[in-house]
From Swiss-Prot:
Keyword Repeat: no
Transmembrane regions listed in the UniProt entry: 26-45
Protein's name according to its UniProt entry: ATP synthase subunit b
GO terms assigned for molecular function: proton-transporting ATP synthase activity, rotational mechanism
Topology class, membrane: Single-pass membrane protein
Amino acid sequence: MDAVILMATEEVGHFGLNTNLLETNVINLAIIIGVLVYFGRGLLGKTLGDRQQQIATAIAEAEERQRTAAARLAQEQQKLAQAKEEAARIREAALVRAKAAKEELIAKAQQEIERLKQTASQDTSAATERAIAEIRERITALALAQAEQQLKERLSHDAELQRTLVDRSIALLGGK
């Protein structure tokens, strides 16, 4: 209902659109553009100046961050190169130590082999000497046993030989 009242009042006061372009629109547009240029120039200039300053500050900050990042990158690349050199040095030192340890182990193994050979040789020599001594003892015992046997046989068969042997033995001991 309010809308109906509003429409009724508009018709009464002749409120409506004037369709004559020359009378209304060009003048209105000129006034609006003039007001916008007069008041908007300062506001637009200030806004554009502020925006230009913000952009310049952002560019300067970005350039500073880029320089800082480039410096950090250079430092990190230098650290990486040093770390690679250190790793290569450590690797080389480890290879040298491994080679020395290998050579030391080989030398110790050779010494142990030589020691075992000498021990085996000494054991063999000792065993040979023991065997030879044992054989000599057996041969001596057998020879004595055989000589005793032969002596008993001769003495029991030959009384004259027995007397001669007793006389010689007494003479040797300092008898007659």
